């Protein structure tokens, strides 16, 4: 059968595609001792769900063993192995939500990830712009492939899982929860922000986004108004060792474990002393720590990592592995085939007390509805309640020194 993707570019960065088996695929099948399963088969899953669940979707070819005479005529049947049809798989993706997000983005370079915090199901994963996977099924032409490769908007690049960007101020609620737990700050800690913070014993100053400052600021206000100086001080007091350790607990610096090939998901960077020395053969400096407090410096994250970290905060430390598969079922009537369901794996970041989680959430609520919230105008008239965190950072593109 010829694989056809009816929704075109809408689901490409989730589903991936199938295409002709090449030498690299054959080498992998030989290594896995599965080449015999592809007798008479020309296509194989190359990316996304098609690749990750290839063995589930593919099935097994059938054949029979017969005895023949000297003229090649069949004398008798020795054995028969009927073909096994691949299983149907059911995904967690909300197609209408996926299409709605894609419509809002309208081809702009962006990524959106929507997770269900109750179980880790991926409801939408959009990387814009995308491309039509049907181009690859029968073998893509050189002209079409070159057009995709040279497109300045990089449609082949999965921004949601491979794009690494400074998480910027979106991480302030996580840092606040960690600092409260560590005793670096309390709910009553107040600073007076004059628009900058100075590294002790130096003349180095780090600016706040609000040049004239925010005045008196506590932890709730620091999230509501995204006060940079509050987090410069936290970063200085915590140090990179504790800061990096805590953010690793939220999943930064590692793959999420989503059911798509590891080669399609970036670890991004949660910097620490060891990382900098391995990367640059340089020691970690105190000045390197300060921008990490506002999600910048060497720190990068994928949109999927950021969504995953948020679900951990929402659940007071409970973590579910993001997953796209709901279950599988036999696609034919006949002998029962075992169904596969994704286990709801969860862990508990139980070192954070309930009051610290609540402070982070209260600050995020005020981002949207507080009188000084950075996103108050966007959510002022919504018929529902929500919480969130804004973040702005300079982002470097795929080409060296290209800013967009």
Residue ranges and their predicted role:
Residues 1-111, 126-159, 164, 335-345:
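Extracytoplasmic/periplasmic proteins that interact with beta-lactams or build/remodel peptidoglycan
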Residues 112-117:
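Short hydrophobic alpha-helical segments used for membrane anchoring or interfacial signaling
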Residues 68-78, 118-169, 174-404:
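Beta-lactam-recognizing serine transpeptidase/beta-lactamase-like catalytic domain environment
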